[in-house]
Regions:
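Alpha/beta catalytic cores of group-transfer enzymes, especially the acyltransferase/condensing modules
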Residues: 128-152
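ATP-binding N-lobe of GHMP and related small-molecule kinases
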Residues: 1-99, 103, 111-129
Length: 152
């Protein structure tokens, strides 16, 4: 069982300058800080070989493409886990509060799935040894693959 704990964040200045429509044409700068509220992601083997997702909504699917939670589906595909996993997400604060919860979930999930893959393959190498690579992959999933209107 792998458990990740990822802090939520609060923005102080520069909101909007981290959106692609702005930073691709000019310079953007944002001041954020992590707070002491977290999103926890638990990843473990499923008992039946299916994909189990337990968030505010519960899903159990045989095929990864049937997973409705788009961030989870794309993170699983990105790290190459297509079945046999249970994912549980618990947050200190509900989504939609402006504290970056979707991005926090994406980072925490990618990190946990990477560690889970490493344990399953009995490997000493984690996919994400560099936090910048983890952040870039999380942005790629949310912004490029899912077209989420979020900042970078």
């Amino acid at each position: 069982m792998i458990i990740s704990k990822t802090p939520l964040r609060i923005s102080f200045a520069g909101g909007g300058t981290d959106l692609p429509s702005y930073y691709k044409t000019g310079y953007g700068a944002v001041v954020n800080a992590a707070i002491d509220k977290y999103i926890y992601v638990i990843v473990k083997d499923s008992f039946d070989g299916k994909i189990h997702l337990r968030t505010t909504e519960n899903e159990v699917v045989d095929n990864i493409n049937d997973l409705k939670h788009d961030i989870t589906r794309e993170c699983l595909k990105h790290v190459g886990i297509l079945s046999g996993v249970e994912i549980i997400s618990i947050a200190d604060i509900p989504g939609g509060t402006g504290l970056g919860s979707s991005s926090c979930y994406t980072v925490g999930l990618l990190n946990a799935l990477s560690a889970f893959n490493s344990v399953k393959k009995n490997s000493q190498t984690l996919l994400y040894t560099n936090p910048s690579v983890l952040a870039e992959d999380a942005c790629m999933i949310e912004i490029d693959k899912l077209s989420a209107p979020i900042g970078k």
